[in-house]
């Protein structure tokens, strides 16, 4: 059904474009090839939601944490301990479940950080994954949620993350959080997300051609509404144990992680590591460059459907399309 509907709408889009120029929802905005990074950067200090913790084994050179809406609902988290550094990104909740005012993404992030804080310093990647999984699984059992979440994976507490282990000198990447290790950059984008982002973009382009305005989009995102039912269903792909499943992906959700899907990077002699969530469309070697790239997109493509195609844009009253976290460390060896 999805391909048929999309095919029909694409034909409609092409027909209308032949009749008139493509409606430019970005009119009065200039898309600059060279990013304007001449900004007031004071917000990086004033609006930073992370309170720095120090480690004897590495120096935190840059860090920033900011929720898309406010600190209380921020589903990103940063952790620095003597032997670990981590950025954890709780997935946007697809259910109405809350505990003490916290949605599932926030709860997942906090549970993962708690597990990392309890890691023995020389733990390996597989045991680390098991401990995080067990922490979330135990929460399900404690709150009588397990049976329901076994049947409805879309309601699971889900998070992605990147973790640096000083003792192992490795970075462990689970899901679509990002990292830079020396000259290596891994965004770890999921193929299924690109498909959904493109579907949302097409639906919204048709809506624009049919007369929707920016004010209309602030009230309702038709592309997001179109893909949302599948976003709820695609959870069946996370930690899916079926071999050869093209679209499966690893996450922290309280169920066994397939270790062959976890990326493990050997740091070697490199000294600089950057960890971030996917709240940054592209990760750069400095916080300001990463922020500048993000701001260029937010200024010129607030719906996140052209310059940067995403499964969601900026909601009215929010600062960005997603929470964001950035952590840059230099290793002492």
Feature names for model-found ranges:
Residues 22-26, 37-333:
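PP2C/PPM-type serine/threonine phosphatase catalytic domain
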Residues 17, 29-33, 210:
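Short, flexible helical or helix-coil boundary motifs
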Residues 3-4, 22:
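Generic short N-terminal amphipathic or hydrophobic helices
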